[in-house]
């Protein structure tokens, strides 16, 4: 989810972020403390617009499948007694679980917009308790929610937690509940008024003894896959290639950790069969590794270099770039470097088909070729983000206890499973190796515009600098122009 309440982009000067390096520990145990469950692709309308958000009986690894439909990742959980089913958007870029209530004006409208994600009714639960009325979260695009913090029973991945705190959106403009699993310091009640934090889901699992460390791994799988997986307290070596390499999370200039941000030290494009990479010149950039963002957002100047390398056409009205849908078959890869580990992203993961509009029409270029969204957008003045278009190509371990993220190339559609428990302490196994001399400071994004990038506005003539047959500009954008892209410039703030 783009941004949160620490609001990196409000600094008047470019701050430096720094950290000390510690190590992720992974322990092989006969009975690992890991909770795992699937995350799923869940069908929603206008998924890119929603960038607002954007089982283990005898073990302690908590596993959950992830739904993955139209670029949003969800998990299934229940709240209350008797259980009420919720599908919540998994978000490493925020920290609260919040859900809609059916009685809100938004959810009770004739279109029933909240039916897919589910709603929570406190009056129907015998274990509900009110905490306070202080829940208040909003996004720059105007969407958000206000309501109550409450406690109730939660059941996720077969694990039940009593008196678990979450929020109810009595007033909401989003149909989707969010399961934020970032730092407790990023919770809305902390960032809004400086209130004491509470144990969100990863911390509550540690507190209850279900996992040993406030850490989890994320495997989104490829764009066409219906499911991925999240493991709280563990990793699955069957889901990645090679070894995990560990880089530090960057802290703010105040010295605290509020978001899962690392130093992106290089971006390039792999063009040759020899594996050589043409790197775009850039200083290290602070980027959030954010599963709640469908697209990825790079500094304007860097995004411009990427666009020029793939002949993308930028539509400033929507803050989106377009490419021919046939580019999904291009064999080039964008390569993202983090001091040492790299994520190589194929074009088939970056080219997003919007599908037809309500009238069955599809976006096309003037030459008749079908137009698709390119999965990289300019960050403007907001913090840069690597969202699902990049994270699908990586296996990631978020270690909130040690303020680290471990990275390895993913194994798409792997059916192999070898679960290891994440323990406590330092340097316990070779599966996660600290990167020597990792970059520990980086610049926050600055808005510079997109110099040298071909632009196109729906309905305009092709740019005169290119022949009409070369100009790759969409004739129209499927309803996006009217609503904008909610993910652009998003951040949390108190209403």
UniProtKB/Swiss-Prot annotation:
<feature type="propeptide" description="Removed in mature form">
    <location>
        <begin position="468"/>
        <end position="495"/>
    </location>
</feature>
<feature type="glycosylation site" description="N-linked (GlcNAc...) asparagine">
    <location>
        <position position="76"/>
    </location>
</feature>
<comment type="similarity">
    <text>Belongs to the peptidase A1 family.</text>
</comment>
<dbReference type="GO" id="GO:0006508">
    <property type="term" value="P:proteolysis"/>
</dbReference>
<feature type="glycosylation site" description="N-linked (GlcNAc...) asparagine">
    <location>
        <position position="413"/>
    </location>
</feature>
<keyword id="KW-0336">GPI-anchor</keyword>
<feature type="active site">
    <location>
        <position position="290"/>
    </location>
</feature>
<keyword id="KW-0843">Virulence</keyword>
<dbReference type="GO" id="GO:0004190">
    <property type="term" value="F:aspartic-type endopeptidase activity"/>
</dbReference>
<comment type="function">
    <text>Probable GPI-anchored aspartic-type endopeptidase which contributes to virulence.</text>
</comment>
<keyword id="KW-0732">Signal</keyword>
<keyword id="KW-0449">Lipoprotein</keyword>
<keyword id="KW-0378">Hydrolase</keyword>
<dbReference type="Pfam" id="PF00026">
    <property type="entry name" value="Asp"/>
</dbReference>
<keyword id="KW-0472">Membrane</keyword>
<dbReference type="InterPro" id="IPR033121">
    <property type="entry name" value="PEPTIDASE_A1"/>
</dbReference>
<keyword id="KW-0064">Aspartyl protease</keyword>
<dbReference type="GO" id="GO:0005886">
    <property type="term" value="C:plasma membrane"/>
</dbReference>
<keyword id="KW-0325">Glycoprotein</keyword>
<protein>
    <recommendedName>
        <fullName>Probable aspartic-type endopeptidase OPSB</fullName>
        <ecNumber>3.4.23.-</ecNumber>
    </recommendedName>
</protein>
<keyword id="KW-1003">Cell membrane</keyword>
<feature type="active site">
    <location>
        <position position="91"/>
    </location>
</feature>
<dbReference type="InterPro" id="IPR033876">
    <property type="entry name" value="SAP-like"/>
</dbReference>
<feature type="lipid moiety-binding region" description="GPI-anchor amidated alanine">
    <location>
        <position position="467"/>
    </location>
</feature>
<feature type="region of interest" description="Disordered">
    <location>
        <begin position="447"/>
        <end position="470"/>
    </location>
</feature>
<dbReference type="GO" id="GO:0098552">
    <property type="term" value="C:side of membrane"/>
</dbReference>
<dbReference type="InterPro" id="IPR001461">
    <property type="entry name" value="Aspartic_peptidase_A1"/>
</dbReference>
<keyword id="KW-0645">Protease</keyword>
<keyword id="KW-0865">Zymogen</keyword>
<feature type="glycosylation site" description="N-linked (GlcNAc...) asparagine">
    <location>
        <position position="136"/>
    </location>
</feature>
<feature type="signal peptide">
    <location>
        <begin position="1"/>
        <end position="19"/>
    </location>
</feature>
<feature type="domain" description="Peptidase A1">
    <location>
        <begin position="73"/>
        <end position="408"/>
    </location>
</feature>
<dbReference type="InterPro" id="IPR021109">
    <property type="entry name" value="Peptidase_aspartic_dom_sf"/>
</dbReference>
């Amino acid at each position: 989810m783009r941004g949160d309440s620490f609001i990196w982009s409000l600094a008047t000067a470019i701050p430096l972020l720094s950290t000390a390096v510690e190590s992720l520990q992974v322990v092989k145990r006969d009975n690992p403390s890991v909770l795992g469950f699937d995350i799923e692709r869940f069908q929603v309308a206008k998924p890119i617009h929603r960038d607002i958000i954007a089982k283990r009986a005898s073990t302690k690894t908590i596993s959950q499948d992830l739904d993955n439909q139209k670029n949003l990742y969800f998990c299934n959980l229940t709240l209350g007694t008797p259980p009420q089913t919720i599908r919540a958007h998994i978000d490493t870029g925020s920290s609260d679980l919040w859900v809609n209530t059916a009685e809100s004006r938004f959810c009770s409208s004739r279109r029933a917009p909240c039916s897919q994600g589910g709603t929570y009714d406190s009056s129907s639960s015998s274990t509900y308790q009110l905490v306070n009325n202080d829940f208040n979260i909003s996004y720059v695009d105007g969407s958000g929610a206000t309501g109550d913090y409450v406690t109730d029973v939660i059941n996720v991945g077969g694990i039940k937690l009593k008196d678990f705190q979450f929020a109810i959106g009595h007033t909401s403009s989003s149909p989707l509940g969010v399961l934020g699993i970032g730092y407790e310091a990023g919770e809305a009640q902390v960032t809004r008024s400086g209130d004491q934090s509470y144990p969100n889901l990863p911390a509550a699992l540690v507190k209850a003894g279900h996992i040993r460390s406030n850490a989890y791994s994320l495997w989104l799988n490829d764009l066409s896959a219906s499911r991925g997986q999240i493991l709280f307290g563990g990793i699955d070596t069957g889901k990645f290639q090679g070894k995990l390499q560990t880089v530090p999370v960057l802290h703010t200039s105040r010295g605290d950790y509020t978001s899962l941000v690392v130093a992106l030290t290089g971006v390039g494009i792999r063009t040759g069969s020899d594996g050589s990479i043409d790197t775009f010149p850039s200083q290290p950039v602070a980027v959030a590794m954010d599963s709640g963002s469908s697209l990825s957002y790079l500094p304007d100047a860097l995004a411009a270099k990427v666009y020029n390398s793939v002949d993308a056409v930028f539509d400033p009205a929507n803050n989106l770039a377009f490419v021919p849908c046939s580019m999904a078959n291009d064999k080039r890869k964008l390569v993202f470097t983090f001091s040492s580990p790299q994520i190589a992203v194929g074009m088939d993961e970056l080219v997003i088909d919007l599908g037809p509009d309500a009238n069955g029409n599809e976006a096309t270029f003037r030459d008749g070729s079908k137009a698709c969204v390119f999965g990289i957008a300019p960050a403007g003045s907001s913090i840069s983000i690597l969202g699902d278009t990049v994270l699908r190509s990586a296996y990631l371990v978020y270690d909130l206890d040690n303020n680290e993220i471990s990275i390895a190339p993913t194994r798409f559609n792997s059916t192999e499973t070898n679960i290891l428990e994440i323990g406590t302490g330092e340097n316990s196994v070779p599966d996660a190796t600290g990167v020597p001399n990792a970059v520990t400071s980086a610049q926050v994004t600055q808005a510079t515009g997109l110099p040298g990038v071909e632009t196109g506005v729906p309905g305009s003539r092709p740019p005169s600098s290119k022949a009409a047959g070369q100009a790759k500009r969409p004739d129209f954008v499927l309803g996006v122009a009217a609503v904008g892209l909610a993910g652009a410039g998003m951040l949390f703030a108190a209403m």
